[in-house]
From Swiss-Prot:
Its main location: cytoplasm. GO terms for cellular component: cytoplasm; nucleus; proteasome core complex, alpha-subunit complex. The lineage of its organism: Eukaryota, Metazoa, Ecdysozoa, Nematoda, Chromadorea. GO terms for biological process: proteasome-mediated ubiquitin-dependent protein catabolic process. SMART domains: Proteasome_A_N. InterPro entries: Ntn_hydrolases_N, Proteasome_alpha, Proteasome_alpha-type, Proteasome_alpha_type_5, Proteasome_asu_N, Proteasome_sua/b. The 26S proteasome consists of a 20S proteasome core and two 19S regulatory subunits. The 20S proteasome core is composed of 28 subunits that are arranged in four stacked rings, resulting in a barrel-shaped structure. The two end rings are each formed by seven alpha subunits, and the two central rings are each formed by seven beta subunits. The catalytic chamber with the active sites is on the inside of the barrel. It is found in: Cytoplasm; Nucleus. This is Proteasome subunit alpha type-5. Keywords: Cytoplasm, Nucleus, Proteasome. The keyword Translocase does not apply. PANTHER family: PROTEASOME SUBUNIT ALPHA/BETA. NCBIfam families: PRK03996.1. The proteasome is a multicatalytic proteinase complex which is characterized by its ability to cleave peptides with Arg, Phe, Tyr, Leu, and Glu adjacent to the leaving group at neutral or slightly basic pH. The proteasome has an ATP-dependent proteolytic activity.
Length: 248
């Protein structure tokens, strides 16, 4: 005799008769409560654009950071639970630094994503906290430039990650994704990608778009001291954002 749905909910590793993990599905729904983020791969590099949602006028706006630096050549943005994202971002940063200290070269974007996916697959599980573990309620976009060129990976709460040309996560991801499908092409420049990302955010955000409630990072290819191809993580200034937003 089958258990009720609520009983299948109790264990993160218990499949329902239909082959579903309800706790993972709930974690994916939590992602849809987060603010919208967009990643776009272009012919000149890759960029991340994220909505910074302030819940109070008393909050210090600069304290909200939706795009984190993993390493010189990799950035990551997220949608979902902030506390969960911090755990995963910290894992990515540690993995990147350990790789640098061990091999004296920069880690690939895919390898960083894989290491975080491995943690997500465990649902934060270990022997001590096994009874309290749950899936991470966060989706992430890893963007960077390595020896293989510009890369953009989408990671969801199930631990699945996919190589993308463009991707949106968060509350308005469905509308943003449709716009990306209609407007994206492989010959995009960074400037065109930036304008596209901000135009889409302007369309899907509930608040009026301005440089205070959006954050953009660009990662362009360069070379390191030994002449090896690598990326350079750069935050787009408020002045540049205002110029592009005004032109929309």
């Amino acid at each position: 005799m089958f258990l009720t749905r609520s009983e299948y909910d109790r264990g993160v590793n218990t499949f329902s008769p239909e082959g579903r993990l309800f706790q993972v599905e709930y974690a994916i729904e939590a992602v849809k409560l987060g603010s919208t983020s967009i990643g776009i791969k272009t012919s000149e590099g890759v960029l991340l654009a994220a909505e910074k949602r302030s819940t109070s006028k008393l909050m210090v706006n600069d304290a909200i950071e939706k795009i984190s630096k993993v390493d010189q050549h990799i950035g990551v943005t997220f949608a979902g639970l902030i506390a969960d994202s911090r755990t995963l971002v910290e894992r990515a940063q540690i993995e990147a630094q350990n790789f640098w200290f061990t091999y004296n070269r920069k880690i690939r974007v895919e390898d960083v994503t894989q290491s975080v996916a491995n943690l997500a697959l465990q649902f934060g599980d270990d022997d001590v906290k096994a009874s309290m573990s749950r899936p991470f309620g966060v989706a992430m976009l890893f963007a960077g430039v390595d020896q293989e060129g510009a890369k953009l990976f989408h990671l969801d709460p199930s631990g699945t990650f996919i190589d993308c040309k463009a991707k949106s996560i968060g509350a308005a991801s469905d509308g943003a994704e449709q716009n990306l499908k209609e407007q994206y092409h492989d010959a995009l420049t960074i400037k065109e990608g930036l304008k596209m990302a901000l135009a889409i955010l302007k369309q899907v955000m509930e608040e009026k778009l301005n440089s205070a409630n959006v954050e953009v990072v660009v990662i362009k290819p360069t070379v390191d001291a030994k002449g090896r191809p690598i990326g350079e993580f750069t935050r787009v200034s408020n002045e540049e954002l205002d110029q592009v937003i005004t032109s929309l």
